[in-house]
Amino acid sequence: MPAKGPLTPQQLSLINRYWRAANYLSVGQIYLMKNPLLREPLQPEHIKPRLLGHWGTTPGLNFIYAHLNRIIQQRNANVIYICGPGHGGPGMVANTYLEGTYSEIYPAISEDEAGMERLFRQFSFPGGIPSHAAPETPGSIHEGGELGYALVHAYGAAFDNPDLVVACVVGDGEAETGALATSWHSNKFLNPARDGAVLPILHLNGYKIANPTVLARLSDDDLDNLFRGYGYEPFFVEGSEPADMHQKMAATLDTIFQRIQDIKKNADVHSPERPRWPMIILRSPKGWTGPKTVDGLVVENYWRAHQVPVANCRENDAHRKILEDWMKSYDPSDLFDEKGALKPELRALAPKGEARIGANPHANGGLLRKELHMPDFRQYAVNVTEPGAIEAQSTKILGDFLRDVMKLNETEKNFRIFGPDETASNRLGSVLEATNRVWMAETLDMDDHLAADGRVMEVLSEHLCQGWLEGYLLSGRHGFFSCYEAFIHIIDSMFNQHAKWLQVARELEWRKPISSLNYLLTSHVWRQDHNGFSHQDPGFVDLVANKSADIVRVYFPPDANTLLWVGDHCLKTWNRVNVIVAGKQPEPQWLTMAEAEKHCEAGLGIWEWAGTEDGLEPDIVMACAGDVPTMETLAAVDLLRQSLPHLRIRVVNVVDLMVLQSPHQHPHGISDEEFDRMFTTNRPVIFAYHGYPYLIHRLVYKRTNHSNFHVRGFIEQGTTTTPFDMTVLNELDRFHLAMEAVERLPLGESVAKPLIDNFTEKLALHKDYIRQHGEDMPEIRDWKWTWPR
């Protein structure tokens, strides 16, 4: 009896053949290197020596792709496809090949038998392409190697893209991750009047690598209740018989796309109701249409289908026969013509031009990227008449600047600010003068700065902030992410994956540059004295420094004017990850705006006004990177100038950390000659650094004077205490820095010992004072730089 549904018998036959073609190409990529159309009996030499790839999820991905093509054609829909199970890469490559996008981008992979052979051979092969939906895959903005981020990327791409539908396949294994579990709440931030739609497709094929999945073992009632609780309207598509499943999927997508159209049509621009967005729960067999058993063991609809369901096909004749029968079951002669091209009636099922999923410009966001309209950062300058004479909250000044970036780009609607409930805490609250926090859930009369059309995105999940921003950037927009320094570690591995994506994408001429991912790390280690050890960790920078030098930049602006320059610069860059570390508390302001510009452009500099070298070779170099280390260094210099008035001191401040490397290691690196001019070739260098000391040693280890670098920083000593005591516990304070300088100088015991005794006594007084009074000593709290220029 014919399956019932919206597809005519002819349409059903065509879409099933298209699906078979995608499945055939997927299997071919995993197994074959020759004889792509099986026009001769399958021989061992036709098969790859190493069989790599994942079959289990792939037929389901191909099934979804074929039906999205149909709905794009039928409704002239604007759709991109996020493949959460990115290990189903063979399917994504196969479908972009069938629609013609792949051959347009990679002409050597032509639409004929020779091109198909190259398509098969290159997959997971040296000199070829990776196994996942990597940057090399047209239409992909999500590799799906590390699981958990598909849905949050989908929402990021949908924000401010009102005509876009982001179809997002969530594997049932990925659905067990923490990041994905919280991503379902992204619908509370999606405004149907100004944003696109996200269509989650939860693919329940039942198994992970070697275990069942949790959601697949829930009843339909439990799943329905779960996702209705999240605010979705689930539609179930379940089965294993292809004709029946095609009809169900076609009918479901017809209903859902009409539902999306109605939701958007009825949305009020200013006060839209939060709709119950549709989603699909697709139950289909893992390894669908593949071998049912191998060697008497169940494969289809079981975890054994996950990767390569038939192994050792070169060596094992029986296995090779299973593979050949499997591939022939798709009947390639019914799918491809004599030349090896997809038959015209099947090619007609794919959309044309940019309507193709693989050619959609939203999945190559650099094509759509527009430069931000930027205010002149100099207008926000702090008026510094003398170094250290006044204090300011650097991030508050930056917040004023970001507020006006928001205002200037309101028409374009291509800039958002992200943070895990920390925008106000991080002193960026000025941005709320220009916009609100986006919020589509219930509001109360007492709520402030919550609105459906807000452009500040706050949720207490660093995973969501990072993922939304990545999706937003990858689809062509701009953003800024502020976070407590210690808790940015929560997204360490998300940063890793994005940096890897950027590194590969930079090498692909067809992938146009996207806006940089900009982090502001504040509420940092040296001012988390009130929250304690759990909040004290500057190590994210160490992770960042491991990545490709072409990708990462790390900045430690010491005051507000340098922070303004750095913030402006980072928002104008592309294909980078920029990390800015700056404090939010009141702190001394050192440089005029003119000085700040010159200093930041160089990345580091000698602060002649702070030193005493008078044009001669210094006796010692006092170097610093970071706002608190800068203040403590200058306080140490103050002590040394008072104690040793004839000592020649040079003060070097580093704002762009990567300048410490050589130009061969990093494009911002300074030459050996410049480094030696700055740090000398034989004088002691006392380096006060914001983070873990070893990073500085690592960056400078090839320099002439490396053996004379004595770096102090965070040495994993923390608690709830006073701000100054944090530096004392880690021996980064002015007294330890001054003692280190005295010990490294050839002063003689008669000069050095009284100084060291004095500084040691000061530390003892400090310890007693804070335990008695609960705050730092007045001479610490009230210290100011008083030396004239």
UniProtKB/Swiss-Prot annotation:
GO terms for molecular function: aldehyde-lyase activity. This is Probable phosphoketolase. GO terms for biological process: carbohydrate metabolic process. Gene3D superfamilies: 3.40.50.920, 3.40.50.970. It is an enzyme of class 4 (lyase). The gene is xfp. It holds the Pfam family XFP. Its EC number is 4.1.2.-. Keywords: Lyase, Thiamine pyrophosphate. Its cofactor is thiamine diphosphate. InterPro entries: Phosphoketolase (IPR023962), THDP-binding (IPR029061), Transketo_C/PFOR_II (IPR009014), Xul5P/Fru6P_PKetolase (IPR005593), Xul5P/Fru6P_PKetolase_C (IPR018969), Xul5P/Fru6P_PKetolase_CS (IPR019790), Xul5P/Fru6P_PKetolase_N (IPR018970), Xul5P/Fru6P_PKetolase_ThDP_BS (IPR019789). Belongs to the XFP family.
